[in-house]
Amino acid sequence: MKLKVFNVREEEATLAQDWANRNHVELSMSEGPLTLETVNEVEGFDGIANAQIEPLDDAIYPLLKEMGIKQIAQRSAGVDMYNLELAKQHGIIISNVPSYSPESIAEFTVTIALNLIRKVELIRANVREQNFSWTLPIRGRVLGNMTVAIIGTGRIGLATAKIFKGFGCRVIGYDIYHNPMADGILEYVNSVEEAVEEADLVSLHMPPTAENTHLFNLDMFKQFKKGAILMNMARGALVETKDLLEALDQGLLEGAGIDTYEFEGPYIPKNCQGQDISDKDFLRLINHPKVIYTPHAAYYTDEAVKNLVEGALNACVEVIETGTTTTKVN
């Protein structure tokens, strides 16, 4: 069996090769993405493992079909970069890795939240200037006295809720589907609006859909409890960035922890030191004094990277050997 792996980082290559040696599978790995220019590299292979970031060109699906490719295994939980229906029409199964390490993202969410609540960034900036005074701008709050709203109560949302509850927070949640595992951890409310009106901190853990794109806009921020904090460790498209910046500037929100930006594709995960960034909204976001921005790194732990690499490769084998996989999304 021969598999083609795209968008491979050095650390992933080592894990992938270890997996290949154990499973007696031949791998060809490429640092670059799957594009119209690179799709011919798939010729002669049985399957594809990918870490697509930008939307996959629709013209690629029929080309893969001609090559006999029946699946693409995405190394992430999100699959919004694929045209799932078009892939299905061409007999191509798209799979994901739905649960690679919910705890990694949950722990990171709470870490950044605590940094915002206790003004750690401002304290560190003062210390670098040898300002050791105690002043009102660095005075924080007790996390355990806060109400936290979890929007999206799947694996990651629930893992996040558990940690906040461990600090003593009242945790409320909203999801179209109620998670039976959430009993005793959070209280469900009837709408997103109800959740944000009550919460001191709102944490997003929902997948992107046509219905929730830019759900968190200025109108929504005006319904937030004054001085609340927004955490987005889910998908950038959930938040209208211009409106978030305006809400922060107006004092509607106290701060924001942002790990995903809607138009991050040209920059993440790349070293852009010394380069001009043309996206002015992105520049405003990453430099805003009330924002802690991180480059889609909430998931990034040893456990998560290993599970993503092996989960995608296992899905490749499963489809090739059985015709389907338990992680199929289309």
From Swiss-Prot:
Query: What is the official name of this protein in its record?
Result: D-lactate dehydrogenase
Q: Which GO terms describe its molecular function?
A: D-lactate dehydrogenase activity; NAD binding
Question: Any S-S bridges, and between which cysteines?
Answer: none
UniProt record similarity statement = Belongs to the D-isomer specific 2-hydroxyacid dehydrogenase family.
Q: What are the catalytic residues? A: R235, E264, H296
Q: What is its EC number?
A: 1.1.1.28
Q: Which gene encodes it?
A: ldhD
Q: Which UniProt keywords apply?
A: NAD, Oxidoreductase
